[in-house]
Amino acid sequence: MINRELIAPESIVIIGGSNNTQKPGGKIIRNLLEGKFPGKLYAVNPKETEVQGIPCFPDITSLPNTELAILAVPAAACPSIVEELASTRNTKAFIIISAGFGEETH
């Protein structure tokens, strides 16, 4: 089932957001800004306080509740990030932009 938070979120956080628009997290933010996303935008990046003009938080615990999270981080970090966002920030929808989820070989 597709929920409203995935297709029409009121707030989005980009985990791994960047000022560098050549990086996935930077491209995503640029596209959301250029597309004039009408809701609240946040980024999480421990090295920044602002990313492309939007508020940036050092970690998930500092972040306000957010409906949709876009993860642009290594695959190994994604499961714990999804769990933390769902349980502590009431995040209902996730988009994962990451490599490293390849199938296990035997």
Model-derived features with residue positions:
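Catalytic-core regions of core metabolic enzymes
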Residues: 1-106
